[in-house]
Amino acid sequence: MTSQPSLPADDFDIYHVLAECTDYYDTLPVKEADGNQPHFQGVTGLWNLGNTCCVNAISQCLCSILPLVEYFLTGKYITALQKFLLPSDCSEVATAFAYLMTDMWLGDSDCVSPEIFWSALGNLYPAFTKKMQQDAQEFLICVLNELHEALKKYHYSRRRSYEKGSTQRCCRKWITTETSIITQLFEEQLNYSIVCLKCEKCTYKNEVFTVFSLPIPSKYECSLRDCLQCFFQQDALTWNNEIHCSFCETKQETAVRASISKAPKIIIFHLKRFDIQGTTKRKLRTDIHYPLTNLDLTPYICSIFRKYPKYNLCAVVNHFGDLDGGHYTAFCKNSVTQA
């Protein structure tokens, strides 16, 4: 899902990018394919190389995200890769991904092969090269992690902090952060408030991630909002789930509540349909309803960071089958054709 406000299709200068790369200046970049059928750039199929539907579905969704496409088509990734003195596995993944995006947006074919990209990632994760069903969420996380590792830059900043003592003393510390096109687009941060139910002292913990996994609260039917409310409701951790309290200096029952302290430009939801409990595994077939536009995350934003984010749907990965086998497909909104 992409954040609003909803802007024209050329927000990320994609028409200018396509024009520079292909020398076409039509209102919509269209090529005549075989059979006199129009071929829209960015609307390109991927060959199934033998149970690679997971790879193809994720690639199609990433291909529909304009700022990511613009970053690779304009060659900005090359500058980021130049920090490597020697070729690395993650730089090969980034280069292969760039070639795939180029084929899908600037190529003449109705269908192209993802083999180079698939092989580059398979060198790092051999499990993905096996002729068996893979998990789309795991594949997506691996792709985003490798792209981030290849393209990241280091930023150094000085932040003010206070040391406890008889008198509080202000000091400045250097903070190192890593940023990339991946963190700029997809990174989200959750803030957990953890309250000890004995001393009632509160501590905070932050968690950063790119894929937001949501529980499914109903067996039959629910909405995406129901999934969000289930995730953000306050949880009581008791018995074997007690957390160590630094004030009581022992494990105590606690109340934990999460809120969003950094909302991403593009949010990725993973619906936890695969349920494994002990030796029992199953797929939840709950019907989940979600809005196409104006998904409002305001109720879940940390109050001091409130920015009223709203999101429009841009792509969905579907899975047909069960845990042992099935097929992945993708529905994507093309940012150029708006279809």
UniProtKB/Swiss-Prot annotation:
Transmembrane segments: none annotated. This is Ubiquitin carboxyl-terminal hydrolase 50. Residues 44-339 form the USP domain. The lineage of its organism: Eukaryota, Metazoa, Chordata, Craniata, Vertebrata. Keywords: Cell cycle, Cytoplasm, Cytoskeleton, Hydrolase, Nucleus. Weakly expressed in a few tissues. It comes from Homo sapiens (Human). SUPFAM superfamilies: Cysteine proteinases. InterPro entries: Papain-like_cys_pep_sf, Peptidase_C19_UCH, Ub_carboxyl-term_hydrolase, USP_CS, USP_dom.
